[in-house]
């Protein structure tokens, strides 16, 4: 079946991580552009695989290239409603190919090819052939399939614009339905190869964290493959309509998370927030100093007012963990009328990147639009506090915000000998961070990067 492909193709490789040291090239991701799209057509040249742009053996090691995947399928039983369902399986099936890593979805894809795969003779043409076979196996209703892979920047840019128009068409349809209109929700387990205890709950008002699967997509997927990774959940008893807690959802999450999580609030970052996988489009995070919520999206390269970027924050709550005060979410959920409704919705949001704010501006209530800060208004807690006060943000009504900053006692700086930090060790970077202490003093770390397995503070 895969005899002419120089690397192994098997589900056993799903979950493989390709680190920088083992990487030949990176495709799309945060340093470039990319997209993926599946389109149902009336006719398709079956088995056609085309590569537009440099092939793997024409690329320079260590470089980053634009990348797009366009899959066209045809079949008498195929419907346009199934496009996003098939498309989301690209994540899973690409990872079947040894030496090829696929992360995220839609226009957020991030791929890598290992040096080992390149040395074995792997090319993008082989990826296209593998996808053709795998999709036919996964979806027997596909009668013909063609795959186009792009690494030419102009071709990827043009395709990206087309793909985004398609994404918006799908998303806008789902906005017409609400949780109260249906009796069934859905669960999705597609990310469990990377986040074994994560169970994604999809409702009309809460799109999957990846942003690629909405309630209609799940319904179509379940009808087509009732034994697949997407399953039905009878809505059943509503335990808390404001937080979005349902008895059957709790039971489904407990069963499919290996008992790790037994309660979930669909519309709150507090108490029992929805678990996070790793391919979420944004993170909502609590800012305790101001009793407000910040949101940072994957595309934002700067630091949040907490002093850490998206990547560090994502590492704190991904992998299927349930971390109070943090929750991965999709950008489409930010357009939902139930967006974090238990926490106050946008009236509790105090910071987000400018581009993200502009993309959801029409869904932010008018009375608070100009009161939510961006990186252009505030880059620290101090700046943010001042902005909120000057603009009379409603979050100030929840708790008093300090008018003055407490005095800080300068501590003599020490520079311990640097020790190389192995890859994968948790890192926290912060321009200013206060550590809890006792005895009438406190410790303030400024412009700190901390690599530590243990911190011991002793008073002589």
UniProtKB/Swiss-Prot annotation:
It catalyses: Co(I)-[corrinoid Fe-S protein] + acetyl-CoA + H(+) = methyl-Co(III)-[corrinoid Fe-S protein] + CO + CoA. GO terms for molecular function: acetyltransferase activity; anaerobic carbon-monoxide dehydrogenase activity; CO-methylating acetyl-CoA synthase activity; iron ion binding; iron-sulfur cluster binding; nickel cation binding. Its cofactor is [Ni-Fe-S] cluster. Keywords: Acyltransferase, Iron, Iron-sulfur, Metal-binding, Nickel, Transferase. Binds 1 [Ni-Fe-S] cluster. InterPro entries: ACS_CODH_B_C, CO_DH/Ac-CoA_synth_bsu, CO_DH/Ac-CoA_synth_bsu_3_sf, CO_DH/Ac-CoA_synth_bsu_arc, Prismane-like_sf. It holds the Pfam family CdhC. [Ni-Fe-S] cluster binds at residues 188, 191, 277, 279. Residues 402-422 are annotated as: Disordered. GO terms for biological process: acetyl-CoA metabolic process. Its EC number is 2.3.1.169. Residues 402-416 have a biased composition (Acidic residues). Monomer. The ACDS complex is made up of alpha, epsilon, beta, gamma and delta chains with a probable stoichiometry of (alpha(2)epsilon(2))(4)-beta(8)-(gamma(1)delta(1))(8). Belongs to the CdhC family. Part of a complex that catalyzes the reversible cleavage of acetyl-CoA, allowing autotrophic growth from CO(2). The alpha-epsilon complex generates CO from CO(2), while the beta subunit (this protein) combines the CO with CoA and a methyl group to form acetyl-CoA. The methyl group, which is incorporated into acetyl-CoA, is transferred to the beta subunit by a corrinoid iron-sulfur protein (the gamma-delta complex). This is Acetyl-CoA decarbonylase/synthase complex subunit beta. The lineage of its organism: Archaea, Methanobacteriati, Methanobacteriota, Methanomada group, Methanobacteria.
